[in-house]
Amino acid sequence: MGNGSVKPKHAKHPDGHSGNLSNEALRSKVLELERELRRKDAELQEREYHLKELREQLAKQTVAIAELTEELQSKCIQLNKLQDVIHVQGGSPLQASPDKVPLDVHRKTSGLVSLHSRRGAKAGVSAEPTTRTYDLNKPPEFSFEKARVRKDSSEKKLITDALNKNQFLKRLDPQQIKDMVECMYGEKLSTGSYVIKQGEPGNHIFVLAEGRLEVFQGEKLLSSIPMWTTFGELAILYNCTRTASVKAITNVKTWALDREVFQNIMRRTAQARDEEYRNFLRSVSLLKNLPEDKLTKIIDCLEVEYYDKGDYIIREGEEGSTFFILAKGKVKVTQSTEGHDQPQLIKTLQKGEYFGEKALISDDVRSANIIAEENDVACLVIDRETFNQTVGTFDELQKYLEGYVATLNRDDEKRHAKRSMSSWKLSKALSLEMIQLKEKVARFSSTSPFQNLEIIATLGVGGFGRVELVKVKNENVAFAMKCIRKKHIVDTKQQEHVYSEKRILEELCSPFIVKLYRTFKDNKYVYMLLEACLGGELWSILRDRGSFDEPTSKFCVACVTEAFDYLHLLGIIYRDLKPENLILDADGYLKLVDFGFAKKIGSGQKTWTFCGTPEYVAPEVILNKGHDFSVDFWSLGILVYELLTGNPPFSGIDQMMTYNLILKGIEKMDFPRKITRRPEDLIRRLCRQNPTERLGNLKNGINDIKKHRWLNGFNWEGLKARSLPSPLRRELSGPIDHSYFDKYPPEKGVPPDEMSGWDKDF
């Protein structure tokens, strides 16, 4: 025998019951485990039920918080409006019912209005224009390669994650986020230093990488900023003053990006994408001859769809209405053939190639299979319905390209001349009056306008300066003089916008747009001598009434629609519609004023400068995607909402919150009861997130707005001929009656001279 271990034999119970005892013990253990399992199961069910209750409570609380937040925003707006009607000197008691405030309320108040008492008035904002011809200190041409800053992969990931957690930035394209990360640069600050100072102009966005930061408003501590959090993002959209301070409590490191680089990144990526898509479309035989504006609309309609290896994009024999362009990856084309059980490979398609184009003409029975050859294949797609609504049916486009449009235009001109002779006569009379007034003021000194003019009253104030009611000395001829501080224009880099306003207004002559007669300049100001419209501001009437009824709102919307129709035909986008920029003439007709953000663009082109009023800007402006005439249609929808309710639909406790509300969209928003079904439909169709889907931007243009059911039966010809009575007309005692305007204190201080010479051609 070996020395290995020997297994002992089991002892046998003398009565032979050892096996039975073992089985009993096992059975007992099983029963005990089953009881324990049932107990645990019951406990788990109880916890799941409790968790369900907690989730339901959380959902209710979330809804309640959202409702309270919305109510708080509404109360804030109402509070601002109430404060607006309390005058600084001897403030009169508030009216019990805003709906009963008479039209001539301004004749019954005499107190001065401080600048702060107009808090309810919405202010425009703007970044530096993308073309800065008149900025003598403009930066050199942007170079992405020069702007890049080296980082390791872990830093890039942490910065990327921080940017993607931000409510605004997470909506940007992945390529834009990637480029932002590449260009952010590191900054180290010692304890006690300020990353941001309250009251100073902002120009950077930051990500906290190391250390501890706290946020203060005055001396009050508001919060601390966690590591890898993004802050200061409003400053990369446009010029703004910081509303709080951010102080380093320890030594800190941040990653920063300035506004100039951010805006160049946004423009660069969007333009590169548009150019690539345009080249794709130019390669399609059905589309290559379309004009630029049609191609641009198709580009804006294209959506990206992704497929993994083996996915069928198209199946043979199916009906289809979608056209595809391969933007990334490879696909194979297979087709059933005689003598083979399985479809046979016909060819392989790569980036830039297209398929399904017949679907744009009519229902197409697919003649082959298109199958993704690899993961993450990307296709640009557009369906026939979208194509037809946006640019027209293929037959309509063919007629357009064959020259039928010239004949149609001639017929339209004849019909228009026959239908609108009264409005043509009115336009001729307006032009004659304008020429006569221009000849009168042409004799005035270009640098000393007040040798010939005297100031009667202040009509309005703003960050730019003031608007004064002036009259020709010894004559009963009045104008509105816009006095713009040159130093302010240079500080905010708005030279291009001021020149643009001058050039555009010099070109215009419409009964729905304020007229420019002459410009002047001296060492402190540039001046615009404008038509005096003394019926008052639409904003102040809306403020006093609370809201308008539907007939009044329709009249206002119709005036704006006619102004937009005129501007867009000339290739001009307005970009700053709001009640504050609508003024009443002596007949109660509305006119657009303040063309500081207006711009002339070519057919099919876009512009990139962030500008407008926060509550009215369109999503594509916020996201720096480039924008065109469709932003005016978006703002028209917002105006309809504000006229009917007294408040714009998107208004947060700060500008960034307002932008996030806009980006969430109007589609799921509940409308108040005072907006009936038809105006609600108009608003929703004007405020589509996708610009190509907006009413006014479809194939029939602005006529779709005029023919909308809410405006059905409106007297457009009477409006253009100014024979339609205005529901907003108020009596004026003469050409210098300014009683419908708030009263303002005199300007404090004298602005410094500004002698850089940017205004030499003004």
Swiss-Prot record:
PANTHER family: CYCLIC NUCLEOTIDE-DEPENDENT PROTEIN KINASE (PTHR24353), PTHR24353:SF24. Belongs to the protein kinase superfamily. AGC Ser/Thr protein kinase family. cGMP subfamily. Residues 453-711 form the Protein kinase domain. Disruption phenotype: Dwarfism, caused by a severe defect in endochondral ossification at the growth plates. This is cGMP-dependent protein kinase 2. Disulfide bonds: none annotated. ATP binds at residues 459-467, 482. It comes from Mus musculus (Mouse). It comes from the Eukaryota. 3',5'-cyclic GMP 1 binds at residues 232-235, 242-243. It is a lipid-anchor. The gene is Prkg2. Binding of cGMP results in enzyme activation. Interacts with GRIA1/GLUR1. Keywords: ATP-binding, Cell membrane, cGMP, cGMP-binding, Kinase, Lipoprotein, Membrane, Myristate, Nucleotide-binding, Phosphoprotein, Serine/threonine-protein kinase, Transferase. 3',5'-cyclic GMP 2 binds at residues 347, 356-359, 366-367, 412, 415. PROSITE patterns: AGC_KINASE_CTER, CNMP_BINDING_1, CNMP_BINDING_2, CNMP_BINDING_3, PROTEIN_KINASE_ATP, PROTEIN_KINASE_DOM, PROTEIN_KINASE_ST. Residues 712-762 form the AGC-kinase C-terminal domain. GO terms for biological process: cellular hypotonic response; circadian regulation of gene expression; circadian rhythm; negative regulation of cell volume; positive regulation of small molecule metabolic process. It is found in: Apical cell membrane; Cell membrane. The lineage of its organism: Eukaryota, Metazoa, Chordata, Craniata, Vertebrata. Myristoylation mediates membrane localization. The keyword Protein biosynthesis does not apply. It catalyses: L-seryl-[protein] + ATP = O-phospho-L-seryl-[protein] + ADP + H(+); L-threonyl-[protein] + ATP = O-phospho-L-threonyl-[protein] + ADP + H(+). It is an enzyme of class 2 (transferase). The modification Phosphoserine is found at residues 110, 117, 431. Residues 1-26, 118-138, 740-762 are annotated as: Disordered.
